[in-house]
Swiss-Prot record:
The lineage of its organism: Bacteria, Pseudomonadati, Pseudomonadota, Gammaproteobacteria, Enterobacterales. Disulfide bonds: none annotated. The keyword Cell membrane applies. GO terms for cellular component: plasma membrane. It comes from the Bacteria. Keywords: Cell membrane, Membrane, Transmembrane, Transmembrane helix, Transport. InterPro entries: ABC3_permease_C, Membrane_comp_ABC_pdt, YbbP. The keyword Nucleotide-binding does not apply. PANTHER family: INNER MEMBRANE PROTEIN, MEMBRANE COMPONENT OF PREDICTED ABC SUPERFAMILY METABOLITE UPTAKE TRANSPORTER. Its main location: membrane. Belongs to the ABC-4 integral membrane protein family. This is Uncharacterized ABC transporter permease YbbP. It is found in: Cell membrane.
Length: 804
């Protein structure tokens, strides 16, 4: 009986929309849940390889031994590293090297790539970067003097797992064993060194140790993991993750709305059937069995189809994201399935319980009186309760993210606008005198049922707003990535350029038709005072290390001025706005620096917005020309070259002390990552658009049912098919235009919060929204309305349906 009734009811368009909306909700949560779960497991494994540890502690001096012993007591593996710069010698040839001394456990995770393969820094031997070997004309098996120690060269170090990217690292790498550091005599009290301690273990061990350690850290010490990475790739991937979360949120919101509209419409369309069944003797228990059984079959079918679609989406996304994921991802846990099925159940209960209760409570009297509706769970109580429950569940699912609050803020603004603009529209229409008959009929229809008009306006506006949000943000992400990696980005850095080499280097590059980026002088100094107040004790990382300063007459293109005036004059400086906010520095304040030779001061006269994600030189402070002349300085520049290694070899021979840094591989990796992620985002746009179209169809279908009886009356009074179709077209076009206008205001509100607080984009009003949304809304709804209307007014079908 239940199966037969379900199969007969299955042909109802409303029930089909409910099934599709629930299926898409399951698919969205399952696909993103599975990918997130697998990526979290796989990337946590990969991230430890990028760091050669699960966590790291950085310090300018050796930490107490008790800290390391405590870590070992808790079951953590502990590794030590020490980095410093010192002079090395091959015979009488000197060369500054960046020394990295490691213990026997290094690397804790990941691979140290060497030539020959499989080498590790053993006591008495060193590994040299190929550039250092070339500069000193050395080969494997030779010896090199590092300070007071003479060590054997075991091979070349090609790639370190935890090397990172630093264009200001002036000297080539030399890797040695920590046991040989004392023999070199290079590290003395007061020497500038950096200690890094790597820790490995499970999350419980790491979290426990972190809670024990953090209260004891000093300002110059930093505890971090890979999630603190703020590089170009790290920030881009974070934005991509936020976009995927936003896609999931919008899909769920649209699915909830579509199920609510379609479920309500389906149950209303079955009031007469239930009333007839009751008059024929059907008991409450029998009807409950039929209705609940049918509902369970819809949920089961939605779970099966949604699960299949979700797994398909997961596989598509995994193929698209394959180049940016670890080679082998572990399987997902059961949690995504529980979340997906739980989401489906909660959505169905929240929006389906009241319509089904109303259906079950239908009175037999409705057979005689069409306006009899049971009074169950008044909307004035039910809607606020459902809204609060939905927000709490979404907050739990999204982790209280700013994404959720921004979208909800946009929805609230949109709801208020719908009320205000809707009433304004109705009042304007009431006063208008129209000559066109279809327009007059359309306007009279909208005025006759104001609450129905406002509810349709709200649903259409919500659909358009959420779709606009997604499409605009996707465009912003892609634009941002293209700005970050323009086609002519420099792929080589030249660093450690002496002042006397600048002119001959420019001539060399010009000879090879190379146009370099700006030449930046680099001076290392420590910020020691702000308005004559010492900065000691301040925990900001920028105050606990030497900063790279520069002077420029021309403002860098990627550093727009946000306050003050450019260029700085004598005894003035331009400061990065983020650091100024963190240190509470305002225009007119004085900052004091200690360089290698002397102390110097400057007044802050401008603040710049610095794009730290760009693979270009960036500086906290830019001085005017001549301000840093008393300090030792080197220079750096960058250029693009794609014509082979001949020029690069000639450059190395002619300027052996200049370091050449090839970032082409980094650019290629970032470009591939962003290309693949953008494809994955397109898949999510398709998913959200499908949900949006379902909501539009559901709402248009509801509108058509309300118009059905009126169409019969008009047709009986002699109205032609063309007039009816034109009337429907005009009515839906007006609804679509106003919905698009309201959606544009709501979308701008949400975008202002999302762009500024979540995606870290500068917010700018998008004029295209104000044109595209109203026009698209009018076009889409007139097409949907016209298509369904054409089916309604076709021949005798209109009367046949009415009679039925």
């Amino acid at each position: 009986m239940i199966a037969r009734w379900f199969w007969r009811e299955w042909r109802s368009p409303s029930l089909l929309i409910v099934w599709l909306a629930l299926s898409l909700a399951v698919a969205c949560v399952l696909a993103l849940g599975n990918i997130s779960d697998r990526m979290e497991k796989g990337l946590s494994q990969q991230s430890r390889e990028f760091m050669a540890g699960d966590r790291a502690l950085r310090s300018s001096r050796e930490v107490p031994q008790a800290w390391l012993e405590e870590a070992q007591k808790r079951g953590l593996k502990v590794g030590k590293q020490l980095t410093f710069a010192t002079m090395t010698f091959a015979g009488d040839t000197p060369q500054l090297a960046n020394v990295k001394a490691v213990d026997d456990i290094y690397p804790m995770y990941g691979d140290l790539q060497t030539n020959p393969p499989g080498l590790k820094p053993q006591a008495g031997s060193v590994l040299l970067a190929p550039r250092l070997m070339a500069l000193l004309n050395l080969k494997t098996g030779d010896t090199i003097d590092v300070g007071d120690a003479t060590l054997r060269i075991a091979g070349e170090v090609i790639q370190e797992p935890d090397s990172g990217f630093n264009p200001f690292q002036m000297a080539p790498r030399l890797m040695m064993n920590l046991a040989d550091v004392d023999k070199t005599g290079a590290v003395q009290p007061g020497s500038r060194v950096t200690w890094r301690y790597k820790f490995g273990g499970n999350e419980n061990q790491l979290d426990g140790y972190e809670k024990w350690l953090l209260p004891q850290l000093k300002p110059e010490q930093r505890w971090y993991g890979l999630e603190q990475d703020e590089g170009a790739l790290g920030r881009s991937m974070e934005r991509s993750q936020q976009f995927l979360l936003l896609s999931a949120l919008l899909t769920l919101l649209l699915a909830v709305a579509a199920v609510a509209v379609a479920m309500n419409h389906y149950c209303r369309s079955r009031y007469d059937l239930v009333a007839i069944l009751k008059t024929l003797g059907a008991g409450r228990a029998q009807l409950r069995k039929l209705i609940v059984g049918q509902w369970l079959m819809v949920l089961t079918l939605s779970a099966v189809t949604g699960g299949a679609i979700g797994l398909l989406f997961e596989n598509v996304l995994m193929v698209l994201l394959k180049p940016v994921l670890p080679a082998a991802l572990p399987p997902a846990s059961l949690w995504p399935w529980l979340w997906a099925l739980g989401t489906m159940t909660v959505i169905s209960l929240l929006v389906g319980l009241r319509p089904y209760r109303l259906l079950l409570a239908t009175q037999p009297l409705r057979v005689l009186r069409n306006d009899v509706v049971a009074n169950v769970w008044p909307l004035k109580f039910y809607l606020p309760i459902v809204s609060v429950v939905v927000v709490l569940l979404l907050a739990g699912l999204m982790g209280g993210s700013m994404l959720l609050w921004a979208v909800l803020a946009g929805a609230v603004v949109l709801a208020l606008l719908c009320g205000v603009l809707g009433w304004m529209l109705l009042n304007v229409l009431r006063r208008m005198t129209l000559k066109s008959l279809p327009l007059r009929l359309a306007v009279s229809r909208l005025l006759r049922q104001p609450w129905s008009t406002l509810s349709q306006l709200s649903a259409f506006s919500l659909s358009f707003m959420l779709l606009a949000l997604l499409l605009v943000l996707r465009g912003d992400l892609l634009d941002r990535w293209q700005q970050q990696l323009p086609p002519e980005s420099p792929n080589y850095f030249l660093i450690n350029i002496a002042t006397e080499q600048v002119a001959p280097l420019k001539a060399f590059l010009a000879e090879h038709q190379i146009v370099p980026e700006s030449f930046y002088p680099v001076v290392r100094a420590r910020l020691t005072a702000i308005n004559d107040k010492p900065t000691e004790g301040n925990e900001d990382e920028a105050l606990n290390r030497e900063l790279n300063l520069t002077w420029q007459n021309t403002r860098p293109d990627h550093n727009p001025i946000v306050a003050g005036n450019w260029p700085p004059k004598a005894d003035e400086v331009s400061m990065e706005e983020g650091l100024a906010k963190r240190l509470n520095v305002a225009l007119g304040d004085t900052v004091t620096f200690m360089g290698d030779t002397q102390e110097f001061r400057a007044k802050v006269t401008s603040l710049r917005k610095v794009d730290w994600e760009s693979l270009r030189p960036n500086f906290y402070f830019i001085f005017p020309e001549g301000a840093l002349d008393g300090q030792p300085q080197s220079w750096l520049t960058s250029f693009r070259w794609e014509n082979g290694n001949g020029m690069l070899t000639q450059l190395n021979r002619q300027f052996p002390t200049i370091s050449l840094l090839d970032i082409g591989a980094i650019l290629k990796q970032v470009g591939q990552v962003l290309e693949q992620v953008s494809r994955a985002l397109e898949v999510m746009v398709v998913l959200v658009t499908a949900c949006g179209m379902l909501l539009l169809l559901a709402q248009v279908q509801v509108g058509m049912r309300q118009r059905h009886q009126e169409l019969v009356v008009w047709r009986t009074l002699g109205a032609g098919k063309k007039l009816l179709r034109t009337t429907l077209w005009c009515e839906f076009a007006m609804l679509g235009f106003v919905s698009g206008l309201v959606a544009a205001i709501g979308a701008e509100t949400a975008l202002a919060v999302l762009q500024a607080k979540v995606f870290d984009f500068p917010w700018e009003p998008d004029w295209r929204l104000w044109i595209v949304l109203p026009c698209s809304g009018a076009l889409l709804l007139s097409l949907f309305g016209g298509w369904l209307g054409a089916r309604l007014v076709k021949g005798k079908a209109l009367f046949r349906q009415f009679a039925g």
